[in-house]
Amino acid sequence: SINNKIKVPTKESIWTISGNNILSNNQPIILEWNNGEGVIFKRKIDLDDKYLFKISQRVENNTNQSIELYPYAQITRNKVPDDIQNFYISHEGFIGVFDEELKEDDYDDIKDKKIVREADEGWLGITDKFWVSAVVPTKGENFKSTFLYKDGFKANYILNNPTKINP
């Protein structure tokens, strides 16, 4: 049977470090959160020699029944930089590729209304003059993305179909 009343981590959850506690080039760290009911959530944080962070998530089901979870990710930017450039050669704001179509949305657009898109493949994020922060949904999994302003600028996605995790 499927248990849909599983406790999941929130922004208040306290994660613990498992194993190595120093993040360095090609030396990842693993954060864990145990829900106290037999399910352990893990986040592996990798840093490469070009300062690219890669965060992967995993769930261990130590219960006696299958569970279903809807994977999601979110990027939050608290405020727009004072020196935003908006040059035609460089986009600053929301960005994503949805089923091979590039979409760019300005901060002003998102402050006025949220933008929702669905796709089977792609990525989404927030970019600036010198950086990009992006999330990549599982390839081939239909997802809904939302760009919005609510207590900060947010780019997020959630898979439309749950992931089943067996014991």
Predicted regions and their residues:
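Soluble non-transmembrane domains of integral membrane proteins
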Residues: S1-P167
